[in-house]
C-alpha cells in the first residue's frame, strides 16, 4: 500500500516511471525469446498484433516473466540444460543446468481460530455499521483494514529438523502468513 491506497506493481512503479526517456512501454505483446549479440543478451523478440518485432537495449536486460515463463523464455532462447534443448532442436547459447528445474508447488493449509470477543475484521464487516466505520476510517484517515494487504505478517522457518534439533536443509521449508480476515 502507498498512503493508504492498495495498488498494483504497475501503479506503484511503472506509472511514475512511464515518462522516462530510457523507457518504452509496449502493451498487447508476447515475448518469444531473447535477442543475443554473441552470448550477451541485448534485447528481446516479441509478437505484437501478429507481427514479429524486436527491442534492443543499450544497458542491462532484466528478465522478470514469473516463475514459469522466465525459465521457459531462457530455454526457448538457448539457455538451459543442453540435452533438453537438443531434444527440441534449440541451439545451445549457454548450457546452464537448473534452468526450468526445481519448480515446487506452493501448498497451503489454512487454520482458523475463533475469537472469544468480537474484535476481528470479519466481525467488523458483518454489520452495516461496521462496514461504514471501516469505510469512513479509510476515507478520512487512509488507515484501517482497507489500507493494508490481507496478510499482515509472515515468515519462513525450518520445520524439518534432525535428532539434535538442527534444520535438515540449508533453506527454510515452511512459510507462514498471518491474516486478519478469513473467507
Protein language model regions, located:
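General beta-strand structural signal in soluble alpha/beta enzymes
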Residues: 26-27, 63, 92-95
Amino acid at each position: 500500500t502507498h498512503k493508504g491506497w492498495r495498488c498494483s506493481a504497475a501503479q506503484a512503479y511503472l506509472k511514475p516511471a512511464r515518462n522516462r526517456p530510457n523507457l518504452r512501454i509496449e502493451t498487447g505483446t508476447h515475448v518469444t525469446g531473447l535477442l543475443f549479440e554473441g552470448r550477451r543478451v541485448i534485447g528481446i523478440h516479441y509478437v505484437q498484433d501478429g507481427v514479429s518485432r524486436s527491442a534492443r537495449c543499450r544497458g542491462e536486460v532484466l528478465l522478470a516473466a514469473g516463475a514459469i515463463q522466465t525459465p521457459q523464455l531462457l530455454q526457448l532462447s538457448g539457455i538451459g540444460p543442453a540435452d533438453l534443448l537438443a531434444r527440441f532442436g534449440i541451439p545451445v547459447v549457454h548450457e546452464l543446468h537448473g534452468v526450468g528445474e526445481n519448480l515446487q508447488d506452493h501448498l497451503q493449509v489454512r487454520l482458523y481460530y475463533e475469537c472469544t470477543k468480537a474484535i476481528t475484521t470479519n466481525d467488523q464487516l458483518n454489520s452495516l455499521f461496521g462496514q461504514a466505520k471501516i469505510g469512513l476510517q479509510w476515507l478520512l484517515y487512509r488507515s484501517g483494514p482497507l489500507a493494508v494487504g490481507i496478510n499482515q505478517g509472515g515468515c519462513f522457518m525450518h520445520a524439518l529438523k534432525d535428532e539434535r534439533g538442527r534444520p535438515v536443509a540449508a533453506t527454510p521449508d515452511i512459510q507462514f502468513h498471518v491474516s486478519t480476515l478469513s473467507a
